[in-house]
Amino acid sequence: LRRQRQMCIRDRECMEERQVTADGVTYPLEEPFFVIATQNPVEMQGTFPLPEAQLDRFLLCLSLGYPEKEQELALLSRPAAVPESKPVATAAQLLAARQELAQVTVSAAVQEYLVELAHASREHRGIQLGLSTRGMLSLLEVSRAAAAMHGRTYVTPDDIKWIAADCMAHRMTARGSMWEENQETCRSIAEELLQTVPVPKESLWN
Protein backbone atom coordinates (compact mmCIF):
# COMPACT_ATOMS: atom_id res chain seq x y z
CA LEU A 1 0.00 0.00 0.00
CA ARG A 2 2.84 2.38 0.77
CA ARG A 3 4.37 1.78 -2.66
CA GLN A 4 0.99 2.30 -4.34
CA ARG A 5 0.56 5.56 -2.44
CA GLN A 6 4.02 6.75 -3.51
CA MET A 7 3.26 5.88 -7.14
CA CYS A 8 -0.03 7.81 -7.01
CA ILE A 9 1.69 10.86 -5.55
CA ARG A 10 4.36 10.73 -8.26
CA ASP A 11 1.76 10.26 -11.00
CA ARG A 12 -0.22 13.27 -9.74
CA GLU A 13 2.95 15.36 -9.71
CA CYS A 14 3.88 14.56 -13.31
CA MET A 15 0.31 15.03 -14.57
CA GLU A 16 -0.34 18.33 -12.82
CA GLU A 17 3.07 19.97 -12.36
CA ARG A 18 4.88 18.48 -15.37
CA GLN A 19 7.77 17.35 -13.18
CA VAL A 20 8.93 14.29 -11.22
CA THR A 21 10.72 14.28 -7.88
CA ALA A 22 12.97 11.35 -6.96
CA ASP A 23 15.25 11.21 -3.91
CA GLY A 24 14.65 14.90 -3.28
CA VAL A 25 15.66 15.95 -6.80
CA THR A 26 13.05 17.49 -9.13
CA TYR A 27 13.24 16.79 -12.86
CA PRO A 28 11.13 18.88 -15.30
CA LEU A 29 9.40 16.87 -18.02
CA GLU A 30 9.81 17.74 -21.67
CA GLU A 31 6.84 19.36 -23.42
CA PRO A 32 4.48 18.27 -24.76
CA PHE A 33 3.85 15.68 -22.04
CA PHE A 34 0.63 13.79 -21.36
CA VAL A 35 -0.47 10.49 -19.84
CA ILE A 36 -2.69 7.91 -21.54
CA ALA A 37 -4.10 5.08 -19.43
CA THR A 38 -6.22 2.10 -20.43
CA GLN A 39 -8.89 0.32 -18.42
CA ASN A 40 -10.47 -3.05 -19.14
CA PRO A 41 -14.20 -2.69 -18.35
CA VAL A 42 -14.61 -6.47 -17.95
CA GLU A 43 -11.66 -7.82 -15.96
CA MET A 44 -11.09 -5.79 -12.79
CA GLN A 45 -9.88 -8.50 -10.42
CA GLY A 46 -6.42 -7.73 -9.10
CA THR A 47 -6.75 -4.01 -9.82
CA PHE A 48 -7.58 -1.13 -7.50
CA PRO A 49 -9.54 2.07 -8.19
CA LEU A 50 -7.54 5.26 -8.56
CA PRO A 51 -8.14 7.93 -5.91
CA GLU A 52 -10.46 10.77 -6.86
CA ALA A 53 -7.64 13.33 -6.84
CA GLN A 54 -5.76 11.34 -9.48
CA LEU A 55 -8.82 10.67 -11.64
CA ASP A 56 -9.45 14.41 -11.62
CA ARG A 57 -6.14 14.96 -13.42
CA PHE A 58 -7.18 12.94 -16.48
CA LEU A 59 -8.58 15.38 -19.02
CA LEU A 60 -10.97 12.96 -20.74
CA CYS A 61 -12.25 9.41 -20.39
CA LEU A 62 -13.20 7.86 -23.73
CA SER A 63 -14.74 4.49 -24.53
CA LEU A 64 -13.60 3.11 -27.88
CA GLY A 65 -16.04 0.21 -28.05
CA TYR A 66 -15.83 -2.39 -30.81
CA PRO A 67 -14.58 -1.50 -34.32
CA GLU A 68 -17.10 -1.14 -37.14
CA LYS A 69 -17.58 -4.12 -39.47
CA GLU A 70 -15.59 -2.44 -42.22
CA GLN A 71 -12.71 -1.81 -39.83
CA GLU A 72 -12.66 -5.43 -38.67
CA LEU A 73 -12.66 -6.63 -42.28
CA ALA A 74 -9.69 -4.35 -42.94
CA LEU A 75 -7.88 -5.89 -39.97
CA LEU A 76 -8.43 -9.40 -41.34
CA SER A 77 -7.20 -8.50 -44.81
CA ARG A 78 -4.04 -6.62 -43.85
CA PRO A 79 -0.63 -8.34 -43.93
CA ALA A 80 0.47 -10.31 -40.89
CA ALA A 81 3.43 -8.00 -40.30
CA VAL A 82 2.96 -5.23 -37.77
CA PRO A 83 2.06 -2.04 -39.69
CA GLU A 84 4.51 0.82 -39.49
CA SER A 85 3.37 3.80 -37.44
CA LYS A 86 4.14 7.24 -38.83
CA PRO A 87 3.96 10.54 -36.94
CA VAL A 88 1.13 12.86 -37.94
CA ALA A 89 2.52 15.96 -36.19
CA THR A 90 5.73 17.18 -34.58
CA ALA A 91 6.09 18.30 -30.98
CA ALA A 92 6.48 21.88 -32.18
CA GLN A 93 3.20 21.65 -34.12
CA LEU A 94 1.37 20.35 -31.05
CA LEU A 95 2.70 23.19 -28.91
CA ALA A 96 1.72 25.72 -31.60
CA ALA A 97 -1.80 24.26 -31.73
CA ARG A 98 -2.05 24.56 -27.94
CA GLN A 99 -1.14 28.24 -28.17
CA GLU A 100 -3.79 28.79 -30.85
CA LEU A 101 -6.46 27.21 -28.64
CA ALA A 102 -5.67 29.75 -25.94
CA GLN A 103 -6.93 32.44 -28.35
CA VAL A 104 -10.43 30.89 -28.58
CA THR A 105 -12.71 33.25 -26.66
CA VAL A 106 -15.27 32.30 -24.02
CA SER A 107 -18.02 34.81 -23.28
CA ALA A 108 -19.14 35.64 -19.75
CA ALA A 109 -22.48 33.90 -20.44
CA VAL A 110 -20.75 30.66 -21.45
CA GLN A 111 -18.46 30.86 -18.42
CA GLU A 112 -21.53 31.21 -16.22
CA TYR A 113 -23.07 28.18 -17.96
CA LEU A 114 -19.97 26.14 -17.07
CA VAL A 115 -20.25 27.21 -13.43
CA GLU A 116 -23.95 26.27 -13.38
CA LEU A 117 -23.12 22.81 -14.76
CA ALA A 118 -20.48 22.27 -12.08
CA HIS A 119 -22.80 23.36 -9.27
CA ALA A 120 -25.67 21.28 -10.63
CA SER A 121 -23.43 18.18 -10.53
CA ARG A 122 -22.60 18.86 -6.87
CA GLU A 123 -26.24 19.39 -5.91
CA HIS A 124 -27.69 16.38 -7.78
CA ARG A 125 -29.23 13.91 -5.33
CA GLY A 126 -27.62 10.96 -7.10
CA ILE A 127 -24.09 12.38 -6.90
CA GLN A 128 -21.86 12.11 -3.85
CA LEU A 129 -18.87 13.92 -5.38
CA GLY A 130 -19.58 16.41 -8.14
CA LEU A 131 -17.38 18.19 -10.66
CA SER A 132 -14.39 19.88 -9.04
CA THR A 133 -13.06 23.33 -9.86
CA ARG A 134 -10.17 21.63 -11.69
CA GLY A 135 -12.70 19.61 -13.67
CA MET A 136 -14.59 22.76 -14.59
CA LEU A 137 -11.37 24.38 -15.85
CA SER A 138 -10.60 21.22 -17.85
CA LEU A 139 -14.07 21.35 -19.41
CA LEU A 140 -13.36 24.94 -20.41
CA GLU A 141 -10.14 23.89 -22.18
CA VAL A 142 -11.64 20.94 -24.06
CA SER A 143 -14.58 23.15 -25.08
CA ARG A 144 -12.07 25.55 -26.64
CA ALA A 145 -10.65 22.62 -28.60
CA ALA A 146 -14.17 21.57 -29.66
CA ALA A 147 -14.88 25.08 -30.92
CA ALA A 148 -11.66 25.08 -32.97
CA MET A 149 -12.53 21.66 -34.41
CA HIS A 150 -15.89 23.08 -35.45
CA GLY A 151 -14.16 25.98 -37.20
CA ARG A 152 -14.98 28.75 -34.73
CA THR A 153 -12.94 31.19 -32.66
CA TYR A 154 -15.42 31.27 -29.77
CA VAL A 155 -17.05 28.64 -27.55
CA THR A 156 -20.78 27.90 -27.73
CA PRO A 157 -22.92 25.81 -25.36
CA ASP A 158 -23.07 23.15 -28.09
CA ASP A 159 -19.27 22.79 -27.90
CA ILE A 160 -19.59 22.14 -24.18
CA LYS A 161 -22.42 19.63 -24.67
CA TRP A 162 -20.44 17.83 -27.38
CA ILE A 163 -17.59 16.91 -25.01
CA ALA A 164 -18.92 17.43 -21.46
CA ALA A 165 -19.84 13.84 -20.57
CA ASP A 166 -16.37 12.60 -21.58
CA CYS A 167 -14.82 15.26 -19.35
CA MET A 168 -17.18 15.00 -16.36
CA ALA A 169 -18.20 11.37 -15.77
CA HIS A 170 -14.89 9.95 -14.51
CA ARG A 171 -14.48 12.88 -12.10
CA MET A 172 -17.78 12.30 -10.30
CA THR A 173 -18.88 9.69 -7.76
CA ALA A 174 -22.44 8.38 -7.67
CA ARG A 175 -24.24 7.57 -4.43
CA GLY A 176 -24.60 3.86 -3.67
CA SER A 177 -22.95 2.80 -6.92
CA MET A 178 -20.43 -0.02 -7.23
CA TRP A 179 -17.02 0.81 -8.69
CA GLU A 180 -17.79 -1.01 -11.94
CA GLU A 181 -21.09 0.87 -12.37
CA ASN A 182 -19.99 4.30 -11.17
CA GLN A 183 -18.81 5.79 -14.45
CA GLU A 184 -21.85 4.64 -16.42
CA THR A 185 -24.15 6.10 -13.76
CA CYS A 186 -22.23 9.38 -13.66
CA ARG A 187 -22.26 9.63 -17.46
CA SER A 188 -26.05 9.27 -17.47
CA ILE A 189 -26.35 11.98 -14.83
CA ALA A 190 -23.96 14.26 -16.73
CA GLU A 191 -26.08 13.86 -19.87
CA GLU A 192 -29.18 14.59 -17.77
CA LEU A 193 -27.60 17.82 -16.50
CA LEU A 194 -26.81 18.88 -20.06
CA GLN A 195 -30.52 18.61 -20.82
CA THR A 196 -31.77 20.38 -17.69
CA VAL A 197 -29.30 23.21 -16.95
CA PRO A 198 -30.55 26.33 -18.79
CA VAL A 199 -28.46 27.38 -21.80
CA PRO A 200 -27.65 31.09 -22.26
CA LYS A 201 -29.32 32.94 -25.13
CA GLU A 202 -27.38 33.01 -28.38
CA SER A 203 -27.21 36.81 -28.31
CA LEU A 204 -25.10 36.58 -25.13
CA TRP A 205 -22.34 34.37 -26.52
CA ASN A 206 -22.35 34.89 -30.30
Regions found by a protein language model. Name each.
Residues R10-D11, T38, F58, L114, ...:
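Conserved RecA-like P-loop NTPase ATPase core
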Residues M15-A89, L95-V104, R144-M149:
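Canonical AAA+ ATPase core
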Residues R12-E16, E43-G46, S63, S77, ...:
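Signal for well-folded cores of large energy- and translation-related assemblies
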